[in-house]
Amino acid sequence: FLGGIPGRDGFYDLNKNHYAHPIENTVIYRFNASLFFANSKLFQEDIENHLKEDTKTVIVDAGTITNIDITAADTLLMLKNNLEKKGIAFYITEHMQGLNTQLRNLGMGSLIEEGCVRRTITAALLDSGLQKPFPLEGVPADLQENLKELQENAEKALSSHKHNTKNIEKIKKTLWLHTLPAEEENTLEEFAWAFGEDTVNEIEKRV
């Protein structure tokens, strides 16, 4: 399960990062294997067992899911429907475009058409209604804003030391500036990623 670190971009394993906090009202689940009949039940149970009363969004980081079979595809659809009944939005993100093709071939194109498939975790969070910096459990909002201001000041400090590599690395380490960029735009590129060879047909349907 993933969360955020105050003042930093990107998403981090909650069990491996002491400073990581869950994003409010959100479950971000990374599944580190292809999804098929033998492990799809575990996948579903892991997510459902981690839900809280205030959970509003579930996001799957499917970056390592390269293949999926019909049983697993059915599980995804069942999970999505179960979550919808509870008022919880469901997203699949971070995977290669080929997985979208597999979903369509298995008759699960509705997941794409209904917006459940997004290119990045950040895009899913923004689509769910959250804004950056994303609110973290147990972290006051004003602290997040203060850290943002601190980063801006740090960037000025970095520019004044641009010829001193040692000072730059020291400032970065002190102020947590090892940030990871995250894509967030809802663009034609993402649309093409989602629909693959069917992109033109899908665009024509919407014109």
Identify what each model region corresponds to.
Residues 26, 48-49, 84-196, 200-206:
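STAS-like cytosolic regulatory interaction modules
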Residues 1-106, 110:
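The feature marks cytosolic C-terminal regulatory regions of anion transporters and related permeases
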